[in-house]
Amino acid sequence: MKKNLLAFMLSALFATSSAQAVEVLAIGSLNGFAHDLSSQTAGALENGVAGNLLGGLGSGFAWAGGNTFIATPDRGPNATAFNPLVDDTASYINRYQTLKMNLVANQSGSNFAFSLTPSLSKTTLLSSSTALTYGSGAMGTGSVNGTTYSLGNGAPALNAINNTYYFTGRSDNFNPALGSSNSNNARFDPEGVRVSNDGKSVFISDEYGPYIYQFDRATGRRIQAFELPANLAVSKLSSQGATEISTNASGRVANKGMEGLALTPDGKTLVGIMQAPLAQDSNKSLRIVTIDIATKVTHEYAYKLTTGSGVSEITALNDHQFLVDERDGKGLGDGSTAVAKQIFKIDLSNAQDVSNMKGDLSSKAVSKTLFIDLVAKLGEKGISASQVPAKIEGMAFGQDVMVNGVNTHTLYIANDNDFLPSLAGDNKFYVFGVTDADLAKVGATYTAQALPAVPEPETYAMMGLGMLMLGAMARRRK
């Protein structure tokens, strides 16, 4: 009996010691002073910044299969002061970047188990086949602190050249007679992004509406808009965020709309999360919204902030468990020291629908468990809190790898450098290794998204052409 007990204890000890804790596998970067591949947008914006500056890549981040990822910059470079009537936003054309993440195992003894080399393979501009509403410039004339400002039309010049309607980050591109959920507004502030299971389209959430749009992945043309619950929208619009906040008693707070977006592994349900509480809610209670892609039916659940000042991302573990990125605004880019950059596991399986509720929703909030403290984990690799990016916003699982003989899930986390590389550094990508044992410690499991083996949508067309050519050749041989 004693021998059996000793054997059991030794077995348990070995199992515990061999189980890996979540660790940083690799760190990579893309030059924040570089430009993307959209040469047509290379000209200077209203604020003098190049319209194709390669920045803000971590606002949204999604796996597209293999080593391919999609990154969505937000509404563009608006940190350069030029016109307070539009909160310094410019006619930056919204887009997403297709990236290759080359992850290669290092020799033993290296500080990191892998090396990560990101590269940019494509830039896709986002557009609509139907007309959008742009600011006329008339509403953008006035005086601020004794200085008079004026604006031109908010439509990008590229509209006329390419005979299309591009979405832009400029805050006055809306119809003032309609609410913020009007899908004909040209203003768009992309945040979360996910790739459909067939690999042919992308879903992108936004802060202005909030909206969730589906775009054709090859062309960037909008396919459809999902109608979100009316209580998320505001009825009185303004090109100035502070004015919009002060004039609305309900709806999303300006610049803090649907910050994160997840897609369940089966590709059937979108799960969006707001960055901050709605105007009608209190006690740090913000909302999670699920959308059935086929039926468009929505549900709302509550999430209680505990450490950070807001939420930046959500990604799926399975059909009911998710990881949520909760953070403060401190760190590199803010000139301060990062404190709260934490990833929590949540579970919606027994959550209460709060669609018809408002106020203090904290008692209805989903359960949450701390999974990764990013500041602590990066500190283990010698990265000081002052060098941890202030805006850790993108999060996505990628391909599994083997680490010391253990199958390990890769969790990619990216920063939004606000198009300010001189202050916030380059576009950074952190790869964390997550094992099933790590997930079991917080009562979670992981199911990978069922993405196609061929990640690039253009390849489908090439394959189709190739099949036709092969068929023609076969017929000739006959």
PLM features per residue range, with description:
Residues 1-4, 456, 474-478:
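Positively charged n-region of N-terminal signal peptides that target proteins for export
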Residues 2-8, 459-462:
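Sec-dependent signal peptide recognition
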Residues 7-15:
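Bacterial N-terminal signal peptides
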Residues 14-15, 218, 468, 478:
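Hydrophobic alpha-helical membrane context
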Residues 21-452:
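Sequence/structural signature of beta-propeller domains
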Residues 455-474:
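A short, hydrophobic C-terminal helix/tail in secreted or cell-surface proteins
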